[in-house]
């Protein structure tokens, strides 16, 4: 294997949407960084089975619905 081509692997803190925190190892961020999740398995309709609305971050959901909403299911 080539030397010095792999990213640094360190411990970070992950904060779920309900405030639950846990530590894991990752190449994301730097040692001790905090990753705040906007959508996770506790809030995503695919895992909750609900028909709840997704939070529209940056207009992405609105843009999608505007473009494909007329197709219907």
From Swiss-Prot:
Pfam families named in the record: Ribosomal_L31
Q: Give the record's keywords alphabetically.
A: Ribonucleoprotein, Ribosomal protein, RNA-binding, rRNA-binding
Q: Name one GO biological process term.
A: translation
SUPFAM superfamilies in the record: L28p-like
Q: Is rRNA-binding found in the keyword set?
A: yes
Any one GO cellular component localisation term in the record: ribonucleoprotein complex
Question: InterPro entries given for it?
Answer: Ribosomal_bL28/bL31-like_sf, Ribosomal_bL31, Ribosomal_bL31_A, Ribosomal_bL31_sf
- Signal sequence interval, chain numbering: none
Q: Which GO terms describe its molecular function?
A: rRNA binding; structural constituent of ribosome
Superkingdom per UniProt:
Bacteria
Q: How does it assemble?
A: Part of the 50S ribosomal subunit.
NCBIfam families in the record: L31, PRK00528.1
Described purpose of this protein according to its UniProt entry: Binds the 23S rRNA.
Family the UniProt entry places it in: Belongs to the bacterial ribosomal protein bL31 family. Type A subfamily.
**Which protein are we looking at?**
Large ribosomal subunit protein bL31
């Amino acid at each position: 294997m080539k030397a010095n081509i792999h990213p640094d692997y360190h411990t970070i803190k992950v904060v779920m949407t309900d405030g639950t925190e846990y530590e894991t190892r990752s190449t994301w961020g730097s040692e001790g960084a905090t990753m705040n999740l906007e959508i996770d398995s506790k809030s995503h309709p695919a895992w909750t089975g609900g028909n709840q609305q997704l939070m529209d971050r940056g207009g992405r959901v609105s843009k999608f619905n505007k473009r494909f909403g007329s197709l219907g299911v």
